[in-house]
């Protein structure tokens, strides 16, 4: 059976991505990162989601990039802001996060002799992060072609971003069609230890907008009524 490494955060997009990988018949190896994020409850969700999808193996890699600061998601001196609309690159951007994550996933994929890596990046209904764009995925694919044994032997590991051109509503509809239980997911940047959402950060607003446009009941549980 062909193998794939899937990056899962515990959120809506990455869970949909895992469902897509399962639907394609991949033997799924799920990978999460504890990088010092404040919303640690997403990792609790990720572990439950990996078990729910019966992945072959689930690993959590601990990184210390949070110590470097530079993002409201990791730096205690910076507050996670409410939804900022069309701000180009918000303070919740974690510098080079997807590059670091994909590099580690690439190494594991080589070890596993996996065919693909799947990431839930999207360039529509997103927070403006530069490492969630199609050109970024294409650039990392070039790196994978050049920097791996498989790549130079003509069997490059494919970097797949199946949600890259989907709106949040389209992503939710896709996941719903694949049987995803979104009540298991945690997307909020300010989620508490129980995984309850704030309802006001970028991620919460985009999630609410997605369910509304998809005309699917939002199962998100909030700290206070929003």
Curated annotation (Swiss-Prot):
The residues forming a coiled coil are none
- Catalysed reactions, as listed in the record: 7-carboxy-7-deazaguanine + NH4(+) + ATP = 7-cyano-7-deazaguanine + ADP + phosphate + H2O + H(+)
An example Gene Ontology molecular-function term:
ligase activity, forming carbon-nitrogen bonds
**What are its cofactors?**
Zn(2+)
Q: Which residues cross the membrane?
A: none
> Which residues bind Zn(2+) per the record?
188, 198, 201, 204
Cofactor: bound how, per the entry note? Binds 1 zinc ion per subunit.
The pathway entry for this protein reads as: Purine metabolism; 7-cyano-7-deazaguanine biosynthesis
CDD domains listed in its UniProt record: QueC-like (cd01995)
InterPro entries linked: QueC, Rossmann-like_a/b/a_fold
Q: Which Gene3D superfamilies match?
A: HUPs
EC identifiers of the protein: 6.3.4.20
Binding residue positions for ATP = 8-18
Kindly report, in one word, the top-level EC class recorded for this enzyme.
ligase
GO-annotated biological processes: queuosine biosynthetic process
Q: Which UniProt keywords apply?
A: ATP-binding, Ligase, Metal-binding, Nucleotide-binding, Queuosine biosynthesis, Zinc
NCBIfam families reported for this sequence: 7-cyano-7-deazaguanine synthase QueC
Q: Its biological function?
A: Catalyzes the ATP-dependent conversion of 7-carboxy-7-deazaguanine (CDG) to 7-cyano-7-deazaguanine (preQ(0)).
The record's family statement is: Belongs to the QueC family.
Supply the name of the protein. Answer: 7-cyano-7-deazaguanine synthase
Q: Which organism is it from?
A: Coxiella burnetii (strain Dugway 5J108-111)
């Amino acid at each position: 059976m062909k193998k794939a490494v899937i990056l899962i955060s515990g959120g809506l997009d990455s869970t949909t991505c895992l469902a897509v990988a399962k639907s394609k018949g991949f033997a799924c190896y799920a990978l999460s990162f504890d990088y010092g994020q404040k919303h640690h409850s997403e990792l609790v969700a990720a572990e439950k989601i990996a078990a729910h999808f019966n992945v072959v193996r689930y690993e959590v890699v601990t990184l210390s990039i949070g110590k470097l600061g530079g993002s409201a998601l990791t730096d205690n001196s910076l507050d996670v802001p409410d939804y900022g609309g069309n701000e180009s690159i918000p303070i919740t951007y974690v510098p080079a996060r997807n590059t670091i994550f994909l590099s580690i996933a690439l190494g594991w994929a080589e070890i596993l002799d996996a065919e693909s890596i799947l990431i839930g990046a999207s360039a529509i209904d997103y927070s403006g992060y530069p490492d969630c764009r199609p050109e970024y995925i294409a650039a990392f694919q070039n790196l994978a072609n050049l920097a791996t044994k498989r790549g130079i032997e003509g069997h490059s590991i494919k970097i797949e971003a199946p949600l890259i051109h989907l709106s949040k509503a389209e992503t939710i509809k896709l996941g719903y069609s694949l049987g995803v239980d979104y009540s298991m997911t945690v997307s909020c940047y300010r989620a508490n230890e129980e995984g309850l959402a704030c309802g006001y950060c970028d991620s919460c607003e985009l999630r609410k907008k997605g369910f509304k446009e998809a005309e699917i009941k939002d199962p998100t549980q909030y700290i206070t009524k929003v």
